[in-house]
Protein backbone atom coordinates (compact mmCIF):
# COMPACT_ATOMS: atom_id res chain seq x y z
CA UNK A 1 0.00 0.00 0.00
CA UNK A 2 0.95 3.64 -0.45
CA UNK A 3 0.57 6.14 2.40
CA UNK A 4 0.55 9.87 1.72
CA UNK A 5 -0.11 13.18 3.44
CA UNK A 6 -3.33 14.36 1.74
CA UNK A 7 -6.69 14.64 3.52
CA UNK A 8 -8.75 11.85 5.03
CA UNK A 9 -11.96 12.04 7.03
CA UNK A 10 -10.77 9.30 9.40
CA UNK A 11 -9.36 11.87 11.83
CA UNK A 12 -5.85 12.38 13.10
CA UNK A 13 -3.73 9.34 13.69
CA UNK A 14 -5.27 7.30 10.85
CA UNK A 15 -3.54 3.93 10.39
CA UNK A 16 -3.47 1.61 7.38
CA UNK A 17 -5.32 -1.71 7.58
CA UNK A 18 -2.11 -3.70 7.20
CA UNK A 19 1.02 -2.67 9.11
CA UNK A 20 -0.64 0.23 10.97
CA UNK A 21 1.27 2.79 8.88
CA UNK A 22 0.29 6.41 9.56
CA UNK A 23 -1.29 8.43 6.74
CA UNK A 24 -3.25 11.59 6.07
CA UNK A 25 -2.68 15.29 6.60
CA UNK A 26 -3.35 18.51 4.72
CA UNK A 27 -0.94 18.31 1.77
CA UNK A 28 -3.35 17.95 -1.18
CA UNK A 29 -0.51 18.02 -3.72
CA UNK A 30 1.39 15.32 -1.78
CA UNK A 31 3.70 13.44 -4.14
CA UNK A 32 4.01 9.76 -3.29
CA UNK A 33 5.95 9.09 -6.49
CA UNK A 34 5.05 7.60 -9.87
CA UNK A 35 3.32 4.31 -10.56
CA UNK A 36 3.17 3.66 -14.27
CA UNK A 37 2.86 0.49 -16.37
CA UNK A 38 2.48 -2.01 -13.54
CA UNK A 39 0.58 -5.30 -13.54
CA UNK A 40 -0.16 -6.68 -10.08
CA UNK A 41 -1.00 -10.40 -10.17
CA UNK A 42 -2.55 -12.54 -7.43
CA UNK A 43 -2.10 -9.86 -4.77
CA UNK A 44 -4.09 -9.19 -1.64
CA UNK A 45 -5.62 -11.07 1.21
CA UNK A 46 -8.57 -10.49 3.55
CA UNK A 47 -7.24 -11.19 7.05
CA UNK A 48 -10.56 -9.92 8.46
CA UNK A 49 -13.29 -7.50 7.39
CA UNK A 50 -11.25 -4.56 8.73
CA UNK A 51 -7.79 -5.86 7.77
CA UNK A 52 -7.51 -6.35 4.02
CA UNK A 53 -4.62 -6.18 1.59
CA UNK A 54 -5.80 -4.99 -1.83
CA UNK A 55 -4.15 -4.95 -5.23
CA UNK A 56 -3.19 -1.35 -4.46
CA UNK A 57 -4.35 0.63 -1.42
CA UNK A 58 -4.01 4.42 -1.67
CA UNK A 59 -4.05 5.91 1.85
CA UNK A 60 -4.27 9.71 1.85
CA UNK A 61 -2.32 9.92 -1.41
CA UNK A 62 -2.21 13.40 -2.97
CA UNK A 63 -2.71 14.71 -6.48
CA UNK A 64 1.04 15.24 -6.97
CA UNK A 65 1.33 11.46 -7.37
CA UNK A 66 1.24 9.96 -10.88
CA UNK A 67 -0.83 6.77 -11.26
CA UNK A 68 -1.31 5.50 -14.83
CA UNK A 69 -1.58 2.17 -16.65
CA UNK A 70 -2.05 -0.24 -13.74
CA UNK A 71 -3.76 -3.62 -13.79
CA UNK A 72 -4.88 -5.59 -10.73
CA UNK A 73 -5.26 -9.18 -11.94
CA UNK A 74 -6.97 -11.94 -9.93
CA UNK A 75 -6.31 -10.37 -6.55
CA UNK A 76 -7.75 -11.83 -3.34
CA UNK A 77 -9.55 -8.63 -2.31
CA UNK A 78 -10.25 -5.26 -3.99
CA UNK A 79 -8.38 -4.32 -7.12
CA UNK A 80 -7.89 -0.66 -6.14
CA UNK A 81 -9.01 1.01 -2.90
CA UNK A 82 -8.76 4.69 -1.99
CA UNK A 83 -8.77 5.85 1.65
CA UNK A 84 -9.22 9.60 1.36
CA UNK A 85 -6.72 11.64 -0.58
CA UNK A 86 -6.88 13.53 -3.84
CA UNK A 87 -4.85 11.27 -6.14
CA UNK A 88 -5.89 11.29 -9.80
CA UNK A 89 -5.69 8.01 -11.71
CA UNK A 90 -5.83 7.05 -15.39
CA UNK A 91 -5.97 3.76 -17.27
CA UNK A 92 -6.68 1.36 -14.41
CA UNK A 93 -7.90 -2.17 -15.13
CA UNK A 94 -9.24 -4.56 -12.47
CA UNK A 95 -9.65 -8.12 -13.75
CA UNK A 96 -11.27 -10.97 -11.78
CA UNK A 97 -10.72 -9.48 -8.31
CA UNK A 98 -12.34 -11.50 -5.51
CA UNK A 99 -14.01 -8.49 -3.87
CA UNK A 100 -14.64 -5.05 -5.39
CA UNK A 101 -12.83 -3.88 -8.49
CA UNK A 102 -12.80 -0.25 -7.31
CA UNK A 103 -13.51 0.83 -3.72
CA UNK A 104 -13.24 4.19 -1.98
CA UNK A 105 -13.88 5.60 1.47
CA UNK A 106 -12.68 8.29 3.91
CA UNK A 107 -13.26 11.24 1.57
CA UNK A 108 -11.43 10.39 -1.68
CA UNK A 109 -12.03 13.24 -4.13
CA UNK A 110 -9.61 12.61 -6.97
CA UNK A 111 -10.32 12.05 -10.64
CA UNK A 112 -10.46 8.67 -12.36
CA UNK A 113 -10.45 8.33 -16.14
CA UNK A 114 -10.33 5.33 -18.47
CA UNK A 115 -11.21 2.74 -15.82
CA UNK A 116 -12.12 -0.86 -16.66
CA UNK A 117 -13.49 -3.59 -14.38
CA UNK A 118 -14.09 -7.13 -15.64
CA UNK A 119 -15.35 -10.09 -13.61
CA UNK A 120 -15.29 -13.56 -15.14
CA UNK A 121 -17.78 -16.24 -14.11
CA UNK A 122 -17.48 -17.79 -10.65
CA UNK A 123 -16.95 -21.22 -12.22
CA UNK A 124 -13.91 -19.85 -14.05
CA UNK A 125 -12.31 -17.70 -11.35
CA UNK A 126 -13.31 -19.73 -8.27
CA UNK A 127 -15.07 -16.98 -6.32
CA UNK A 128 -17.83 -14.44 -6.68
CA UNK A 129 -17.06 -10.72 -6.59
CA UNK A 130 -18.98 -8.45 -4.25
CA UNK A 131 -19.35 -5.32 -6.43
CA UNK A 132 -17.62 -3.80 -9.40
CA UNK A 133 -17.65 -0.52 -7.44
CA UNK A 134 -18.14 -0.05 -3.70
CA UNK A 135 -18.23 3.58 -2.62
CA UNK A 136 -18.79 5.08 0.79
CA UNK A 137 -17.73 8.07 2.81
CA UNK A 138 -16.79 6.71 6.24
CA UNK A 139 -18.03 3.44 7.73
CA UNK A 140 -18.16 4.85 11.26
CA UNK A 141 -19.52 8.32 10.43
CA UNK A 142 -21.40 8.80 7.16
CA UNK A 143 -21.41 12.60 7.64
CA UNK A 144 -17.62 12.89 8.08
CA UNK A 145 -15.93 15.58 6.01
CA UNK A 146 -14.49 15.92 3.51
CA UNK A 147 -17.08 13.76 1.80
CA UNK A 148 -16.03 11.17 -0.78
CA UNK A 149 -16.76 12.74 -4.17
CA UNK A 150 -14.47 11.47 -6.94
CA UNK A 151 -15.10 12.47 -10.54
CA UNK A 152 -15.10 9.43 -12.85
CA UNK A 153 -15.18 9.41 -16.65
CA UNK A 154 -14.85 6.88 -19.44
CA UNK A 155 -15.56 3.72 -17.42
CA UNK A 156 -16.41 0.23 -18.59
CA UNK A 157 -17.83 -2.22 -16.02
CA UNK A 158 -18.44 -5.83 -17.06
CA UNK A 159 -20.11 -8.20 -14.58
CA UNK A 160 -20.85 -11.88 -15.02
CA UNK A 161 -23.81 -14.26 -14.96
CA UNK A 162 -23.27 -15.16 -11.29
CA UNK A 163 -23.76 -11.50 -10.29
CA UNK A 164 -26.99 -11.05 -12.27
CA UNK A 165 -29.15 -10.50 -9.17
CA UNK A 166 -26.53 -8.61 -7.15
CA UNK A 167 -25.29 -5.03 -7.02
CA UNK A 168 -22.87 -3.99 -9.71
CA UNK A 169 -22.30 -0.67 -7.98
CA UNK A 170 -22.82 -0.01 -4.27
CA UNK A 171 -22.91 3.65 -3.28
Where are the model-predicted features located?
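Beta-strand/loop edge motif enriched in small/polar residues
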Residues: 1-171
Amino acid sequence: HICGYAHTNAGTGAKSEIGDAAYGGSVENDNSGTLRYIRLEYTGYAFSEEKEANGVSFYGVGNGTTVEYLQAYKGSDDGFEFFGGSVNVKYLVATDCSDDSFDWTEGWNGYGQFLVAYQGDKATIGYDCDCLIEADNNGKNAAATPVSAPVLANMTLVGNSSTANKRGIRL
